[in-house]
Amino acid sequence: KIGCAVAGSTSVLMSKANMNLPLESHVLQAFVSESLKPLIPGVITFGAGHFYISQSDKGGLVFGGDIDGYNSYAQRGGMDMLEDVCEGGLALMPTIGKARLLRMWGGIMDMSMDGSPIIDRTHIKGLYLNAGWCYGGFKATPASGWCFAHLLAKGYSHSLSENFQLDRFKNGYMIDEKGQGAQPNLH
């Protein structure tokens, strides 16, 4: 059995098996500030501004926001998104405005068309897929791993992931929730 869980490179890797997936790859930027005294006890998300922030053990603020808005495999970001993310952060927490930015980077996100992941077997015997986690991939790793391990070990989906089937896109059974998937109607 082979399990494919490679995030933003899923489409590229699975194309080598002649699979065309309902995924788009986008850059999601993240930022880290200088070390500060404890300010944020957990993770704070701001849906209206599409902003998230937490504080590392070393005191740096780790934050980010929306995808760059175009398909890309580049692992770098642009200044326009930096400005957008910082505006969202300042709208939520004006006190972070004096923190100095130390670094920024971009990671590739595999975005499903309905904003929900795919945890399923493929039409190729012994090949299983865990993809399309959009913005929540790293945060969802424990539950994702649990459900994917169940599928690989037992051959059928865990009850928590039984709706995350690959064929839902072909059959028109997209998951109707506030997922933040790609927006193919805008491309």
Regions found by a protein language model. Give the residues of each.
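Flavin (primarily FAD) binding-site architecture
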Residues: 4-19
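Alpha-helix/helix-capping structural signal
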Residues: 8-9, 87, 143
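Short glycine-/acidic-enriched loop or helix-start segments at secondary-structure transitions
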Residues: 13-16, 42, 73-74, 139
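Short hydrophobic/aromatic-enriched beta-strand-loop microsegments
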Residues: 21-27
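Active-site lid/adjacent beta-loop-alpha segment flanking the redox-cofactor pocket in flavoenzymes
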Residues: 35-126
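C-terminal catalytic lobe of FAD-dependent flavoproteins
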Residues: 48, 90-187
